[in-house]
Amino acid sequence: MPRLGVVGATGAVGRVVVGLLGERGFDDVRLFASSRSAGTEIDGRLVEEATPGALSAGDLDVCFFSVGSKASRELVPHAVRGGALCVDKSEAFRLQDGIPLVVPEVNGARALEHDGIVANPNCCSIPLSLVLKPLQDEAGLRAVRVATYQSASGKGARRLQQLLDEPQAEHDLSADWSFDGEEFDEETKIREETRKILELPELPVSATCVRVPVAVGHAESVWVETEEPLDASRAREVLAAAPSVRVDEFPTPRAAAGGDEVLVGRIRPDRAGDGLSLHLACDNLRKGAALNGIQIAELVLSQRPVAA
């Protein structure tokens, strides 16, 4: 049984990682967090402080990081030196050359090329890639446009609690991303990560991101132009056969919450141009984050692609 660590165990994603590891039969799990949360317990397990010494001690085989980019940059190298495979959820390493950015059902073989770190993609890039990959294989991709509707939990446990505590009439979440030139950094991430995952470095991808007053579950409206003709009926068949994707007449965040599949529907011709329009929803804490990271680790540990 591998010896596992979860850094950021008290956060929104970290807690889901801990729960999913238990569901999947992993019981040698140590929990780490900041000094502020150290000493608390999760499901009877003591939370330790995530220090360089603790992470580099050489007694962890896999370490899941669900912390901010600054903390990941500081702590991940120590765990790597200790011999652990580090699966990092932050943006710190995603676009770095030589570090695989992996969705197991899409480009799982890349995880086996790791040198101690595998990056876990953005919570919108994961479901988008899962839907685009089968369309890419069927007809090629010419261009992608996406509008995201992202839940409060995507910003973390504090943002989620704020939503749950405030009166419904005050649910008007402002944009909480930083500008990167003329677009949000989140929009840049989706474009660059999707290109890297699909191995299409020149693919035109345009994203518009919106934060919405939903607790859990991200939704995305997607417009796809393919290289070869692809009608809605055939696209529906292709997506129905894709791993970790389920065709649903009208996907919603509520329907996706608590599940491990990407729901995709509204598959139809794009009336404003060539291509297709579709809508998807995904639990951003599970397949959009925690589950994808665990599947990466399972893939590397087994040295074979994970089953959907």
Task: Go through each PLM region and give its residues.
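N-terminal Rossmann-like NAD(P) cofactor-binding subdomain of oxidoreductases
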Residues: 1-175, 203-204, 256-263, 267-272, ...
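A broad, low-specificity signal for short, low-complexity segments enriched in glycine/proline
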Residues: 25-28, 179-187, 239-243
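C-terminal active-site/capping subdomain that shapes the small-molecule cofactor and substrate pocket
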Residues: 206-211, 216-308
